[in-house]
UniProtKB/Swiss-Prot annotation:
EC number: 7.1.2.2
Keyword Membrane (UniProt): yes
GO molecular function, one term: ADP binding
Function: Produces ATP from ADP in the presence of a proton gradient across the membrane. The alpha chain is a regulatory subunit.
Assigned GO CC terms: plasma membrane; proton-transporting ATP synthase complex
Gene3D superfamilies in UniProt: 2.40.30.20, ATP synthase alpha/beta chain, C-terminal domain, P-loop containing nucleotide triphosphate hydrolases
Keywords recorded for this protein, A-Z: ATP synthesis, ATP-binding, Cell inner membrane, Cell membrane, CF(1), Hydrogen ion transport, Ion transport, Membrane, Nucleotide-binding, Translocase, Transport
Protein name: ATP synthase subunit alpha 1
Residues given in the record as ATP binding sites: 169-176
Site residues (Required for activity), renumbered to this chain: 373
């Protein structure tokens, strides 16, 4: 069969018209150097700050330095198999993590992947780790309490829903213990909890998870882990991931509590990344934006208005406010609260609980220093009964500390000073509390009432703990109705006062401690 030139050209034309190449536009680059978890990439012209870059083997890096000819990115995970010349791809996506009720009771890593061996997490909701905090108009004032279960905290340094209260102190002063007890105390309160462990030993984290499980609080809690053995990038991002998980509840009209344990280690991880990216160092070798690192995180903890929740849920949730309460932890070196990161976080938060090594070693636990611990907004959120009864606690402790210092130099003290010293000693003893034993509103109220109304004058200091335990046991047996009323409402009036007086006087008459 012979084809003439016209037919040949017609066939070629037909082929050309039908020719189809499957093509896709990809933002691609080449790795030019790999060192200490930092990769430098040539290409990737359209990459965004904070964009996920896909690496060979299904891993990801985070674009942080955008330069004229190259991109500096930090690898999220192991980087031993990465080599120069490998091709990488921009995803066009900012880092997102899974959020929602399916994460409650689970232990996840920074990327929201389960690491507790309980199988995959079934959730279809994802949220970016970096979100702009709610604006001024979208917020509501803090006026509902978060009960930590600690007498010393709930009476002197009350915390409200939507507040940021810093827990600060040297190592081994009970910072984590206080935060864990606050989480355990929320199991009946309807507040969801998120515990973010940054740069801690895996054994310590395992112990925390076990304790939460033992006390029935894990089902209500999400644990986000970036342990000491993980990449600096994951330690730096862990608080933002945890915050996104907590915001899920806030934005839907629920209440959540988040603990960052601790932000000192996050700042160190960020310093490491910044120095490796050749960013100019500042004070204590931290980069210039270390304040912004913490402020943009802690500003996301807030109480949001009904309108915000309604708008966010497209009208599905009406008339409910949401809140995210933050308890950031900062570790100081030799009690130096004037270091760079501690002063930054103190200025960002709404108050601080300062735990002192001297008090801890003296057996006063929780080792709260009432002199420099403060809650700037919690007073308006305090339960009415605790607010009414605990007014003199801080004053009594402050006067006792001052008098105790003078009493060391003087032996002949007048009767009034002796009384004041005795009262201060007893209040100090009364503020002590065992770990994993949070107290209800009623329990705190009746103990503080006994101290404030002078019912402890004839009780020996050594027998005070027995007196407290016996009083609480007696109250639960004799006045169950009053106990449940106070725990539910937190109200205080002359009728309740009369019931309290009768309860304590009847108990003292039994002499059963």
């Amino acid at each position: 069969m012979q084809l003439n030139s016209t037919e040949i050209s017609a066939l070629i034309k037909q082929r050309i018209e039908k020719f189809n190449v499957a093509s896709e536009a990809r933002n691609e680059g080449t790795i030019v150097s790999v060192s200490d978890g930092i990769i430098r990439i040539h290409g990737l012209a359209d990459v965004m700050q904070g964009e996920m870059i896909e690496l060979p083997g299904g891993r990801f890096a985070l674009a942080l330095n955008l330069e004229r000819d190259s991109v500096g990115a930090v690898v999220m995970g192991p980087y031993a198999n990465l080599q120069e010349g490998m091709k990488v791809t921009g995803t066009g996506r900012i880092l997102e993590v899974p959020v929602g009720p399916a994460l409650l009771g689970r232990v996840v890593n920074t990327l929201g992947e389960p690491i507790d061996g309980k199988g995959p997490i079934e959730t279809e909701t994802f949220s970016p780790v970096e979100v702009i905090a709610p604006g001024v108009i979208e917020r509501k004032s803090v006026d509902q309490p978060v009960q930590t279960g600690y007498k010393a905290v709930d009476s002197m340094i009350p915390i409200g829903r939507g507040q940021r209260e810093l827990i600060i102190g040297d190592r081994q002063t009970g910072k984590t213990a206080m935060a864990i007890d606050a989480i355990i105390n929320q199991k009946q309160s309807g507040i969801y909890s998120v515990y973010v462990a940054i740069g801690q030993k895996a054994s310590t984290i395992a112990n925390v998870v076990r304790k939460l499980e033992e006390h029935g609080a894990l089902d209500n809690t999400i644990v986000v882990v970036a342990s000491a053995s993980e990449a600096a990038a994951l330690q730096y991002l862990a608080p933002y991931s945890g915050c996104a998980m907590g915001e899920y509840f806030r934005d839907r009209g629920e209440d959540a509590l988040i603990v960052y344990d601790d932000l000192s280690k996050q700042a160190v991880a960020y310093r490491q990344i910044s120095l490796l990216l050749k960013r100019p160092p500042g004070r204590e070798a931290f980069p210039g934006d270390v304040f912004y690192l913490h402020s943009r995180l802690l500003e996301r903890a807030s109480r949001v208005s009904e309108n915000y929740v309604e708008k966010f849920t497209n009208g599905e949730v009406k008339g409910k406010t949401g809140s995210l309460t933050a308890l950031p932890i900062i570790e100081t070196q030799a009690g130096d609260v004037s270091a760079f990161v501690p002063t930054n976080v103190i200025s960002i938060t709404d108050g601080q609980i300062f735990l002192q090594t001297e008090l801890f070693n003296a057996g006063i636990r929780p080792a709260v220093d009432p002199g420099i611990s403060v809650s700037r907004v919690g007073g308006s959120a305090q339960t009415k009964i605790i607010k009414k009864l605990s007014g003199g606690i801080r004053t009594a402790l402050a006067q006792y500390r001052e008098l105790a210092a003078f009493a060391q130099f003087s032996s002949d003290l007048d009767e009034a000073t002796k009384k004041q010293l005795d009262h201060g000693q007893k209040v100090t003893e009364l503020m002590k509390q065992k770990q994993y034993a949070p107290m209800s509103v009623f329990e705190q109220a009746v103990v503080i009432f006994s101290a404030e109304r002078g019912y402890l004058v004839d009780v020996e200091l050594a027998k005070l703990a027995d007196f407290e335990a016996a009083l609480l046991s007696y109250a639960k047996g004799q006045s169950a109705e009053l106990v449940s009323q106070i725990d539910e409402t937190g109200a205080w009036n002359s009728e309740i006062e009369a019931q309290f007086v009768k309860l304590v006087e009847d108990f003292k008459a039994t002499q059963t401690w």
